[in-house]
UniProtKB/Swiss-Prot annotation:
Record's protein name: Carbamate kinase
Main location: cytoplasm
Protein's cellular compartments: Cytoplasm
Enzyme Commission number: 2.7.2.2
Family membership noted in the UniProt record: Belongs to the carbamate kinase family.
A GO cellular component annotation in the UniProt record: cytosol
Metabolic or biological pathway: Metabolic intermediate metabolism; carbamoyl phosphate degradation; CO(2) and NH(3) from carbamoyl phosphate: step 1/1
SUPFAM superfamilies: Carbamate kinase-like (SSF53633)
Organism: Latilactobacillus sakei
One of the record's GO molecular function terms: carbamate kinase activity
Disulfide bonds: none
Record's keyword terms, sorted: Arginine metabolism, ATP-binding, Cytoplasm, Kinase, Nucleotide-binding, Transferase
One GO BP: arginine deiminase pathway
Reactions the enzyme catalyzes: hydrogencarbonate + NH4(+) + ATP = carbamoyl phosphate + ADP + H2O + H(+)
Length: 314
């Protein structure tokens, strides 16, 4: 069987359970890894990316609460790097355990990834990316008083949430390193939380206060390492049009042109499914012989047994 190079972008539900303790998240990560090892067993080369919204949000709360002259709060880019280490550590250990249980001898590595953005991206003037937990209006005002530069908005009636800029990625600094690891058959965890956003200043990289959409970062990484497939794992088995309406339709095999027509019809929610669709379109346009798949973690077994989920091709 020909080895496929696959980038798998994990949704937040693959890491965080209702219990935000380290032990609970470690357990959730291991259950996720058990599903992903099925790809390895059939010879695929895996590059794993993941979200970090809840984790980085909680770290920011801790930073703000203990901010003092002796223990100054770290900026958002540094906190993003902290979350990559945290989640990467959990995931590496989970892979090592599950691989041992399956009798597979493979190495696993986490790469703290820097995602290059344009410092002039319009996103910096319009923070939209929600991070961290939901607050009541009073709690949000309290958080804002602690960190006056933070922006909070009401999120679809579920409460108030901090929002930060989310510029589009234009490069991945560590892509050549990740490529070498994958070619050496190392399972690689990278672009966690979309990577640490950095902007070029001459021959330097400067961290910026932002969060990169992990799906867009995963697409850029898949493009740069020449992945054969991009799998975006989310909470549903398939993408739907006319969602929650009597004529709801499940999409199985769909072309880029069809998806672009659906976007014109406003078929996909801007805050959730639309970025995933845009990611899939961008990837397939950049690599026309490849395919993108949007499905759920629980549907991975069906995907491996036969084509499942929503499969996007040129």
């Amino acid at each position: 069987m020909t080895k496929r190079k696959i980038v798998v972008a994990l949704g937040g539900n693959a890491i965080l359970s209702t219990d935000a303790s380290a032990n609970a998240q470690i357990k959730a990560v291991k259950e996720t890894v058990k599903q992903l090892v099925a790809f390895v067993k059939q010879g695929d080369q895996l590059i794993i990316s993941h979200g970090n919204g809840p984790q980085v949000g909680n770290l920011l709360i801790q930073q703000a609460a203990s901010d003092s002259e002796k223990t100054p709060a770290m900026p958002l880019d540094t906190v993003g790097a902290m979350s990559q280490g945290e989640i990467g550590y959990w995931m590496q250990n989970a892979f090592n355990e599950v691989l041992a249980e399956e009798g597979l001898a493979l190495d696993v590595a986490t790469i703290v990834t820097q995602t290059i953005v344009d410092a002039k991206d319009e996103a910096f003037q319009n923070p939209t990316k929600p991070i961290g937990p939901f607050y009541s209006e009073a709690e949000a005002k309290k958080q804002q008083s602690i960190n006056p530069e933070a922006h909070f908005v009401e999120d679809a009636g579920r409460g108030w949430r901090r929002v930060v800029p989310s510029p589009r990625p234009i490069g991945i600094q560590e892509a050549p390193v990740i490529q070498k690891l994958v070619e050496g058959n190392v399972i690689t965890i990278s672009a966690g939380g979309g990577g640490v956003p950095v902007a070029k200043e001459g021959n330097k990289l400067r961290g910026v206060e932002a969060v990169i959409d992990k799906d867009f970062a995963s697409e850029k990484l898949a493009e740069l390492v020449g992945a054969d497939m991009l799998i975006i794992l989310t909470a549903v088995d398939n993408v739907y049009v006319n969602f929650n309406k009597p004529d709801q339709k499940k999409l199985t095999n769909v072309s880029v042109a069809e998806l672009e027509d659906y976007i014109k019809d406003d078929q996909f929610a801007k805050g959730s499914m639309l970025p995933k669709i845009q990611t899939a379109i961008e990837y397939v346009n950049n690599r026309p012989d490849s395919k993108a798949i949007i499905t759920s973690l629980d549907n991975v077994k069906n995907l491996l047994a036969h084509d499942a989920g929503t499969i996007i091709t040129k």
